[in-house]
Every structure is written in structure tokens, then in C-alpha cells.
Swiss-Prot record:
The keyword Transferase applies. InterPro entries: DNA-dir_RNA_pol_insert (IPR011262), DNA-dir_RNA_pol_RpoA/D/Rpb3 (IPR011263), DNA-dir_RpoA (IPR011773), RBP11-like (IPR036603), RNAP_asu_C (IPR011260), RNApol_insert_sf (IPR036643). One of its GO terms (cellular component) is cytoplasm. Keywords: DNA-directed RNA polymerase, Nucleotidyltransferase, Transcription, Transferase. Pfam families: RNA_pol_A_bac, RNA_pol_A_CTD, RNA_pol_L. It catalyses: RNA(n) + a ribonucleoside 5'-triphosphate = RNA(n+1) + diphosphate. It comes from the Bacteria. Its EC number is 2.7.7.6. Residues 247-328 are annotated as: Alpha C-terminal domain (alpha-CTD). Homodimer. The RNAP catalytic core consists of 2 alpha, 1 beta, 1 beta' and 1 omega subunit. When a sigma factor is associated with the core the holoenzyme is formed, which can initiate transcription. One of its GO terms (molecular function) is protein dimerization activity. This is DNA-directed RNA polymerase subunit alpha. DNA-dependent RNA polymerase catalyzes the transcription of DNA into RNA using the four ribonucleoside triphosphates as substrates.
């Protein structure tokens, strides 16, 4: 029999301080120690695991490396890059995009000047200063914007397909600006050794604190489910059943080694997978859907086509295939 532990009755929201970018959430009562246990897990997931949008790189006409200066612009390229890292976006776009700006001086280049060509995103901190352009200068800049999680260094934003002069930028995807955890004592009846967990969540405005808390909780729950469903009891199989399992294992292993070029796919999907270095069914099913949508020129039409192909083999995206020990 499992001892019945004290659980929170609900999550309270401090309405007096609640805004579109700040929320205080209170969970009580909790068993002693669980305020820190749950609070730290929520804090880490909020800060590092929520998806967001950020600039991944730029290309400025006439500039070929990141340590350059630009004629007619007060700031040098490293300073412009530092300012661009601070730009915050609200976006429903699931893949990367590019926007091109032509700026003629005299002008203060602000974050609000970064406009989506097809409405893919919206800049939140429009008044952020990027650069100062004098009266005789004209600057053309390509800005590359992507989706991701947490923090991605500039090195990982570089790829062979980028144009000459592309300058990769550290991407700060996380939409969470700060999370503060406070644990206090609370009472249940005559007992005073329970805990109250308080989470102060501040976002950049691209996601509400309520949605951030809900998404973080779902991410944690999805991981904990693996442990909750774990059973240490090993099933006993007959020799015939073991042989059947071995045959099924080898059959699946052979299927996962199937080359992408052997599948009945459109030329567009073939090219997208080739550029992403996805060569086999095993490579494909080990990817998540959101990963594929981040690849260049890979859209929902290609994703739907691939899902239909996988369904023919009773496969799906996001599979764990490590036990099949496929060669890279």
C-alpha cells in the first residue's frame, strides 16, 4: 500500500501582480522537501527548455567577417551583433526565415525596423537601438531568424549552405527572462511542517506566464511518465517466442537501414532530406517533427508526405532506435 502523500489542492495566481509578462504562482500544501524538488525542476525547464524565436545570423553587403567596420555606421559589426542578440520576437513560425532590410541614413536603426516580409514574426522590443547610420550611408542587411530552445552558440548556427559573408550569432531562444523560486512553511490543520512553493515567472512577452508554466509542467510530466510506467518484472518467454522476438528485431533493424532514395518520395522531399544528411529510415524516424520543420525549404507538405510513408511501415517520428545499434 502506498502512503497517501499531501498534494496541492490547486495552483493559486497572485492577481494583484499578474500581467502578460509576469506571474506569481503558488502551490500548497506540499510534503517537506517537495517545494525545492518540484520548484527546481520547474525553474530549470522554464529557463532552458521552452521554445522561442531568435536571430541566428546576418549578412551585410560589403562586410565579409564579423570584425569589420561599416562605412557611415557609428557602431562596428561586433557591437551591432551584440545589439541584435537582444531582439525579442513573437512568432508562430515553425521554421527559419529571412528578411532583408535596406536602411538609408540619417537614421537610428531600431529593432522595430526588422519587419517580416510575410508576417512570420513580430518584434516585441521595437525601441531597442541597433545602430546609427549617417546621412550619406545606405546599408543592406539580411537577417536570418530561427526557432529553437534555450541557448545555441554561434558555432552551431554555421552551416555549409550559408552565403559568403554570413555572420553567425549566438541565439537566445528562451522566452523566459527570469524565474524566482521561494519555499515557505505552511499549515494543514495542526501540522506546520508542510511547504508552500512560490514561482515568480517573468517572460519576454512572446508567451504568457500561464502558458509557460503549463508547458513546463507538460515537459516534466512527459519525462516522468517513463518512470511511472516502468516495471522491473521480466517476462518469461518460450524458446519459440524468443526466436520470434529475434526475427522481429532483425526485421525492424533491416527496415531501419532502408535508404531514403529507395522510398517513393517527391524530388523536393528527397532534396530536403539529402541536405539535412538524413540517409536512411533510421535517420528519419529518430528525428522529431519540429526538427524537420527547422530545416531549410522543409514545409508541412513534405512533412505530411513523410508521415504517410512512415505509416506504411508502422513507424513514426521521434522513435528511440538506439537498441538496434545502427551504424552511422
Amino acid at each position: 500500500m502506498i502512503y497517501q502523500m499531501q498534494m496541492p489542492t490547486k495552483i493559486d495566481v497572485d492577481e494583484a501582480t499578474h500581467t502578460g509578462s509576469f506571474g506569481r504562482f503558488i502551490a500548497q500544501p506540499l510534503e517537506r522537501g517537495y517545494g525545492v524538488t518540484l520548484g527546481n525542476a520547474m525553474r530549470r525547464v522554464l529557463l532552458a527548455s521552452l521554445p522561442g524565436t531568435a536571430i541566428t545570423g546576418i549578412k551585410i553587403d560589403g562586410v565579409f567577417h564579423e570584425f569589420s567596420t561599416i562605412d557611415g555606421v557609428r557602431e562596428d559589426v561586433p557591437e551591432i551583433v551584440l545589439n541584435l542578440k537582444k531582439v525579442r520576437f513573437k512568432s508562430n513560425c515553425k521554421r527559419s526565415c529571412k528578411t532583408t532590410l535596406t536602411l538609408a541614413g540619417p537614421k537610428d536603426f531600431l529593432a522595430g525596423d526588422i519587419v517580416a516580409q510575410e508576417g512570420e514574426f513580430e518584434v516585441l522590443n521595437k525601441d531597442l537601438h541597433i545602430a546609427t547610420i549617417n546621412s550619406e550611408a545606405t546599408v543592406t542587411i539580411d537577417i536570418y531568424i530561427g526557432r529553437g530552445r534555450g541557448y545555441v552558440p554561434a558555432e552551431e548556427n554555421r552551416s555549409d549552405g550559408m552565403p559568403i559573408g554570413f555572420i553567425a550569432i549566438d541565439s537566445i531562444y528562451t522566452p523566459i527572462k527570469n524565474v524566482k523560486l521561494t519555499v515557505e512553511n505552511t499549515r494543514v490543520g495542526q501540522k506546520t511542517d508542510y511547504e508552500k512553493m512560490i514561482l515568480d515567472v517573468e517572460t519576454d512577452g512572446s508567451i504568457t506566464p500561464d502558458d509557460a508554466i503549463s508547458l513546463a509542467g507538460k515537459i516534466i510530466n512527459d519525462h516522468i511518465t517513463f518512470f511511472a510506467n516502468f516495471s522491473p518484472t521480466e517476462e518469461e518467454f518460450s524458446e519459440e517466442e524468443y526466436k520470434q522476438l529475434d526475427d522481429e528485431f532483425e526485421s525492424m533493424r533491416k527496415l531501419l537501414q532502408t535508404k531514403i532514395e529507395d522510398l517513393d518520395l517527391s524530388v523536393r522531399s528527397h532534396n530536403c532530406l539529402r541536405l539535412a544528411e538524413i540517409d536512411s529510415l533510421g535517420d528519419l524516424v529518430s528525428r522529431r517533427e519540429e526538427e524537420l520543420l527547422n530545416y531549410k525549404n522543409f514545409g508541412k507538405k513534405s512533412l505530411t508526405e513523410l508521415k504517410e510513408q512512415l505509416e506504411k511501415f508502422n513507424l513514426k517520428f521521434g522513435m528511440d532506435i538506439t537498441r538496434y545499434q545502427l551504424k552511422g
